[in-house]
Amino acid sequence: MQLGSWEIGRALGIPIRVHASWFLVFFLVTSSLASGYLPANLPGLSEERYWAMGAVAAVLLFGSVLLHELGHAYVALTYRIAISQITLFIFGGVAHMREEPPHPRAEFLIAIAGPAVSVALGALCLGAVELAGMAGDQLAQRVAHPQQVVRREEERDRRGRHQVL
């Protein structure tokens, strides 16, 4: 075990580790969202819900960092470069390559793979919001207040039945 980090799983056969510093960032992201951004933008929720939403956002942030690092790792593996581990830490993540890329083109492709995954993930998220036909704030509002969505749908159903009769 690497000092100050813990293995949390494997992806592509590569050990995924979380460094102790990750927990500091997790707490800072969660607390800043729960005590600042979320109450200001989604008023009226319980404190527990703000903290839960902040924690989910922090986990998703680090999930995106992990996918970014897996992008680097995947391309490195296509060049038969072994990856000893991926570590998530305070400044993001790092894919530990056991050797240097064989040529500049391979090095460039490995380097650009992580940002390409991040751009693709961002486009996927924007596309999902666009396909849902609502802005990000509206989507967050629906996630935060699902009972209001259900009530509106029930009301619409009631009105529709009365109009048909």
Language model segments and positions:
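Small-residue-rich helix-interface/hinge motifs
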Residues: 1-32, 36-38, 43-44, 50-108, ...
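Short glycine-rich loop/turn motifs that provide flexible caps or phosphate-binding loops at active sites
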Residues: 12, 91-92, 113, 121, ...
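Alpha-helical transmembrane segments of multi-pass membrane proteins
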Residues: 106-117
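Hydrophobic transmembrane alpha-helical segments that form the core helix bundle
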Residues: 115-142, 152
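N-terminal low-complexity segments that are often proline-rich with Ser/Thr-Pro
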Residues: 137-165
